[in-house]
């Protein structure tokens, strides 16, 4: 986030550039536009290094104590999105999160919660992302920030939840067929990120679009 309120980073396309920093890691630079200051509430934590659920909050607290004025400037939300460049870090590694149903704490019914996949947990810290944030902050005199949940609870965040509707040859080994039709249901197709069978390591929007177009091409014309 740029500290000078006279400077703005929003007056460009939403995703302005990208770079592959290593064989597995791809970084995109994103702006939210001028009227998304509420998103700043998700990022109001100083950039915090690697650790666990005990050490990362302590590192964050230490950062606040060392730089109190910088932290106070972070808490001012007005104009945040117009002065902030988001670093979207993606990796092509095979990792996963799992969904499970959990009874609601209050009232009836269930809710979906996420948890780390036991065999392929997704990372809670990506060093390349932190280094990119530090580099940009140094060269723009800006303030580098972390997602609040990552800094305070060592819980990662994701914008691209992919998979879940497995492509198979029958209901015994999949949810959808090669044309993304749900087994056992007529005229029901899965055309969102749930149908993507692997992690592309880049923004999946074009992959999802291409797969949706392929699925639609197999739908018979209405006569």
What are these model-predicted stretches?
Residues 43-138:
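C-terminal catalytic lobe of FAD-dependent flavoproteins
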Residues 2-4, 20, 34-37, 92-95, ...:
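Short, glycine-/Ser/Thr-/acidic-enriched flexible segments
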Residues 132-140, 212-223:
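Internal hydrophobic alpha-helix adjacent to the cofactor/substrate pocket in enzyme cavities
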Residues 1-3, 89-90, 141, 217-220:
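Hydrophobic/aromatic-lined pockets within catalytic cores
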Residues 2-5, 186, 203:
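Glycine-enriched catalytic-core subsegment of oxygenase/oxidase enzymes
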Residues 85-88, 111-198:
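A glycine-rich dinucleotide-binding beta-alpha-beta segment and adjacent secondary-structure elements
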């Amino acid at each position: 986030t740029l500290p000078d309120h006279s400077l703005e980073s929003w007056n460009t396309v939403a995703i302005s550039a990208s770079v592959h920093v290593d064989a597995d890691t791809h970084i995109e630079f994103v702006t939210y536009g001028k009227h998304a200051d509420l998103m700043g509430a998700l990022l109001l934590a100083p950039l915090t290094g690697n650790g666990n659920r005990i050490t990362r909050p302590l590192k964050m607290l230490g950062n606040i104590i060392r730089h109190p004025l910088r932290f106070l400037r972070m808490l001012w939300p007005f104009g945040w999105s117009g002065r902030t460049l988001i670093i979207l870090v993606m990796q092509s590694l095979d990792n996963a999160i799992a969904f499970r149903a959990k009874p609601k704490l209050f009232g009836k019914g269930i809710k979906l919660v996420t948890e780390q996949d036991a065999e392929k947990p997704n990372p809670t810290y990506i060093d390349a992302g932190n280094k990119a944030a530090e580099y940009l902050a140094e060269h723009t005199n800006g303030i580098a920030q972390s997602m609040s949940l990552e800094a305070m609870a060592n819980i990662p965040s994701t914008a691209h939840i992919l998979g879940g509707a497995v492509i198979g040859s029958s209901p015994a080994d999949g949810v959808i067929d090669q044309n993304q039709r749900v087994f056992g249901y007529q005229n029901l197709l899965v055309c969102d990120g749930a149908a993507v069978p692997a992690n592309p390591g880049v923004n999946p929007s074009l992959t999802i679009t291409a797969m949706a177009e392929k699925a639609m091409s197999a739908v018979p014309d209405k006569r």
